[in-house]
């Protein structure tokens, strides 16, 4: 399936009412803090971008923060997350937006790895990540609070070499 047409842009104040108040079974720990990040001045900062569909409607947001796997800057990776409004789910926008943000990181930073994780029961997001080029790497036991209990998550990652053009 080809990627849906999607644009990623800095968040605007007018976006926030559309992005607050998540309607998803995977968020029961309190109000979403979507838009809490200032618009990033650089991809190197933690932040979020608004996901806009082909018709110009705000569909959700994709955000990121940094994780270190070693003591030096070369050992860090970006951890991304996505939230889509219910009426925009199941149309390929999540896959396209996550693929696009990975491309932005690999084009504009020296990062070698981009990660994402999701609830073990969120099969739709697992498919979206796999469609965006991510590889399932493992189970994160008891990593996420949901539905009154700690739940398992699934870790995904994509490496720069995974998306390199093949000869």
Where are these predicted regions, by residue range?
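Acyl-donor (CoA/ACP) binding surface of acyl/acetyltransferases
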Residues: 1-25, 48, 52-167
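Active-site rim helix/loop that mediates acceptor-substrate recognition in acyltransferases
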Residues: 27-54
């Amino acid at each position: 399936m080809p990627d849906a047409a999607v644009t990623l842009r800095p968040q605007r104040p007018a976006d926030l009412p559309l992005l607050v108040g998540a309607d998803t079974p995977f968020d029961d720990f309190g109000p979403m803090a979507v838009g809490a990040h200032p618009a990033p001045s650089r991809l190197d900062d933690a932040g979020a971008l608004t996901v806009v569909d082909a018709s110009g409607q705000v569909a959700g947001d994709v955000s990121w923060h940094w994780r270190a796997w070693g003591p030096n800057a070369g050992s860090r990776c970006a951890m991304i997350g996505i939230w889509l409004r219910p009426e925009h789910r199941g149309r390929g926008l999540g896959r396209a937006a996550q693929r696009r943000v990975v491309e932005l990181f690999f084009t504009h930073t020296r990062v070698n790895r981009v990660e994402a994780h999701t609830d073990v029961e969120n099969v739709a997001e697992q498919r979206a990540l796999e469609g965006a080029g991510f590889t399932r790497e493992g189970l994160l036991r008891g990593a996420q609070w949901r539905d009154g209990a700690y739940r398992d998550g699934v870790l995904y990652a994509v490496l720069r070499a995974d998306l390199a053009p093949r000869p």
